[in-house]
């Protein structure tokens, strides 16, 4: 086998007839497959052993030669070479066609490549190819023109009139003649000349033709190769035929399609030999053309060829495209050996880096390792007996398994793997039963619960894989979430509840005010029930044995909680107080997150993981001790409720009357009613919350962040309030009851609308979110950190994102973990807070915001000058580790996952604004999609093109806003009916400012404000959607994606470069072409940055493998083949497809020459053979 890692690129081009014959091992002449009696392949048929190789290893067809010793011998009786049967997966055959046929991809694709080259409309071309009309090949001295289309009658007339003076033909043969006579160089010069003169539609067509001509010129493809004289036959094992139980056969559709081609081809040969009448031959040629079309791409033209049950047959193109096609099913998603799956159960006794693996599963997964060990330890004499021991599960096996398994990490994965934390490594511990045990703290990352979820286990086999699992993927190394750098292993539910209960402080309880000499005495007093867990006591705290110490006051629970928590996390200023407890506050979920975050930054992951296990144990222990439960009596309905509701009802009646008298419109009445009930619900809730005891169990659950929220308490003990109906419109009749009192039938019915919509939305959202993630991954998969610093001096100016007075994202979050471009100087003290080029750490970012600095220039992926990917300095800190990012980190994929993973949490709703036209502003997931696809948004806002002063004029007919700039230039905007004007009379506007409410078209911003303006807009708008849902995502992820959306230039004028007008070029390729033109003293090309949506950007990538495996497979491959594209295997996807190591992380070139030394494992290879 050739070394996979040896080639640098992969090229695709048109195959010439000679090339197809060269690939082939023989011609397939008969449509037969296998003999129905002997079940052996027929000679010269579709499964012929002479052409494709033997069906059995080392055995010829007739049985004269059997065994390995005849390797390479060609049998003199049956002509089959004695070799391995797997050659049937690689040997190809061919069919010599009696008449040429066209390749449907090049004739039928959009735009039709054949049509553009011949300058014919696809319709006329189709008539010629399918024998409905004649085409003039050589007009001779007649008044006919070349490529003129003649009907049957016109042709007959012309023959009568001119006789043999001209030449016309039909079918692929005629087209082939025309294609052969094309002079590409002359055509290129002619088209470029035309381009300078033409405008409008003509120019567009000329550019398209020029593109195809250039593609053929540069790729050295011959246009005539778009017509096939020979059809290749793919290897038989890729279109298998298998016998089913009932003696029937199941076969691949391709065999049917090939059979049709062979039958029609043979019939045509026979007719030609017989010299049949022209009309019959023509019909047969047409049928052959249709058969080849169906084989290549069934259903592309006309009705698809169907099999039994009217099912369209799967052609070669169908084998490649879609989710079940070759690319996505087999090349990008392979099934792997050494894996298993089982149900998960919780394992609270596990350490943070451990998982419980069922014994039987472990034995099966580690079978070869166990067998090797059994032979080594002399339990078995050879591999075969070791295998028998394992299969019979002898008692010695378990001891050996324990040894093998220790120090050998396994990978656990839960589908759907939405981000990289969906696969983590653990050290396995053998457990009884058949369920995998999972540590409770990693559930958040996996989004796992124990209601029947299943997980898959994978065994990393090689030493390299084990090293990577241990040092990069072990759960301890995944404490922070890559999307925002916050801890993702925060305790949840019971653990939070226990910690909250433990750290509550109560007045006047048993043992309050007692003084203890040390912590042990306190613990003894608590265990003997002499002091309450919540009592405030004093304990003498010492830093060492010699230290006299100091009395510290806190609750018993907080002393217990602090026992194993590092006391230098920064909650207490240790310069002022050495002895106070570090965590001397009520521990809610958020507070615990802060503790973990500070511990990680201060002490790293090892100490943090020990602390996490301690918090977990405490939490479970004290939530059990606290015995916090839910009872009906915990929900007290506030007494003020009845009074508040009756007041609201009176107000609603008042509005009804006013409406009936015609004092207010129905719209106003509706809005006032909704407002009244919303206020009332709030008041009832406030009354309820004020009346709840701090020790009320339901309040404890909600307040601690363990489960439930204020909104749910309202529904239990207050009133449910207003509900939405299926269209998302609020129903004006509220639900006055709560769940404690029970709902009336009508109320229950009202609430079902919104509830069902919620469920339907969730199902749709999951699919949409998954598709968005897929597109994001595809557009950014080749963004890898390729160098430490690209050396650029530019970046972006970060300031807080605001919407009016409301802050969407504070400056702190935008600058932390980034490199500064200039020295950042304190405005008052004039000290340098952060020197030029340094990372802005948390404390520096806090100092900057406290100093009142509003703008900070930072390095950004948006301004990075790395040719492929981005550089480490522009990217900044790796959020998952808190360290500067390393070369080789696949930041593009991380960005896509970070944006896509919370996608399911976003809502689907479109937001109804009041007003008649009610312009719907899209929100939630559809809004994110709209932004990344750079679509024209719904509810479009009008924006100002110039800067200047506003003048608003209203007449009966229309409203107008006029903007006048300093040079007295005036632009007038007509405001459509129902739009809300955002600006005020006399206001000064900047270019790009909104005049009416709504969303702005990003293409307008690009035109008016330029690239930086549109980048800022995309980041701000995406952040707005996510922050509204309470999801924090770091800006740099959105920057990586928007960098990809703006990485192309649309060429306007080509100048003296080789670029084509209207083509999309890579920014760096464009600069290079211009540089070359200027050096040669020519005119450079002009162009503008194009804003592409993520789907378009993915398909515009330089790698044809990546684009083909994404969408529109046939279109991408057609174009790539004509251009003779070469894929330089820069991104991850291309390398996965061809089976190379990905060029990220340890797969980068710089790590190629590192060898890993280990004990030799030749034994294992031998075991593999046995298995």
From Swiss-Prot:
Top EC class of this enzyme: transferase
EC number: 2.7.7.6
SMART domains: RPOLA_N (SM00663)
Cofactor: Mg(2+); Zn(2+)
Signal peptide: none
Keyword annotations of the record: DNA-directed RNA polymerase, Magnesium, Metal-binding, Nucleotidyltransferase, Transcription, Transferase, Zinc
Positions contributing to Zn(2+) 2 binding: 790, 864, 871, 874
UniProt cofactor note: Binds 1 Mg(2+) ion per subunit. Binds 2 Zn(2+) ions per subunit.
A GO CC term assigned to this protein in UniProt: DNA-directed RNA polymerase complex
Binding-site residues for Mg(2+), renumbered to this chain: 449, 451, 453
CDD domains, A to Z: RNAP_beta'_C, RNAP_beta'_N
Function: DNA-dependent RNA polymerase catalyzes the transcription of DNA into RNA using the four ribonucleoside triphosphates as substrates.
Protein family membership: Belongs to the RNA polymerase beta' chain family.
Description of how the protein assembles with itself and partners: The RNAP catalytic core consists of 2 alpha, 1 beta, 1 beta' and 1 omega subunit. When a sigma factor is associated with the core the holoenzyme is formed, which can initiate transcription.
UniProt-listed NCBIfam families: rpoC_TIGR (TIGR02386)
UniProt name for this protein: DNA-directed RNA polymerase subunit beta'
Source organism of the structure: Alkaliphilus metalliredigens (strain QYMF)
